[in-house]
């Protein structure tokens, strides 16, 4: 079903047995995908520039990352996966197993419609959270501002936070918190891109914009870059994540809860 939903041909596979490695009733499923694109149509940091808009696409839930943390919280609170949780409107197990939203067709359609002049980069928010993944598609010297107050954090994330007594810093460094995909686009087409995503049935909103530090090392409205990573007001500057030296993401504002 996932291959059909994303337009991906399934060209091969195998069922391998590993005696002595896995228990008789255990199984593991793994897959890999390969894509091909013309060099002239590659998206990435070299297309991102000052003034670009940073657009969020809503996640469907936890997606496929952070389950080590989630399992520890479930164990800590002693919750049954079959128990009904009022704030979810369904059982805990059903909420935790909500399928990961697939963005492939939507992202391809946006590039087809707006071209590489309009769509500059995509960032899939996986392990490490929003800022760690977004920073990797930004060029060095560039900062993307992200306003935490621009969306309401889905209930499942606050359940994990409260149940595990996890700080918001720990949460945003581990889980997607409601943002599954980010598009960095030309400001000139931002409103049209937003409309197209929403028309496709995926909630979208502007997270922030792309800027650069001034010659004096300051970011307009936030002060010195060198002092932001330890700002007591909740402002965080994140860069150099996952072994990639690229741009940076400046998180500010407070999360909204439903």
What is each of the regions a protein language model found here?
Residues 48-95:
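Acidic, glycine-rich loop-and-beta core segments that form the ion-binding/anion-interacting portion
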Residues 1-6, 22-27, 87-97, 101-258:
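Glycine-/charge-enriched secondary-structure boundary and capping motifs
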Residues 1-68, 209-211, 254:
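Glycine-rich anion-binding loops of enzyme active sites
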């Amino acid at each position: 079903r996932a291959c059909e939903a994303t337009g991906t041909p399934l060209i091969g596979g195998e069922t391998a047995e590993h005696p002595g490695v896995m228990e008789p009733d255990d199984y593991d499923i793994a897959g890999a995908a390969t894509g091909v694109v013309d060099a002239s149509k590659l998206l990435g940091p070299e297309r991102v520039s000052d003034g670009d808009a940073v657009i969020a696409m809503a996640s469907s839930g936890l997606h496929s990352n952070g389950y080590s943390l989630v399992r520890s919280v479930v164990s800590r609170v002693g919750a049954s996966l079959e128990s009904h949780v009022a704030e979810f409107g369904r059982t805990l197990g059903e909420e935790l197993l909500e399928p990961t939203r697939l963005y492939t067709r939507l992202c391809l359609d946006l590039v087809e419609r707006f071209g590489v002049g309009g769509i500059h980069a995509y960032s899939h928010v996986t392990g490490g959270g929003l800022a760690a993944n977004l920073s990797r598609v930004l060029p060095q010297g560039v900062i993307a501002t992200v306003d935490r107050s621009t969306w309401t954090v889905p209930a499942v994330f606050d359940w994990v936070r409260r149940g595990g007594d996890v700080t918001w810093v720990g949460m945003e460094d581990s889980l997607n918190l409601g943002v599954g995909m980010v598009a960095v686009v030309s400001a000139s087409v931002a409103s049209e891109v937003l409309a197209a995503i929403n028309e496709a049935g995926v909630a979208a909103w502007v997270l922030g914009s792309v800027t650069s530090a001034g010659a004096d090392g300051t970011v307009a409205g936030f002060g010195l870059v060198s002092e932001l990573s330890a700002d007591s007001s909740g402002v965080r500057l994140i860069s150099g994540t996952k072994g990639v030296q690229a741009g940076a993401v400046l998180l500010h504002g407070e999360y909204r809860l439903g």
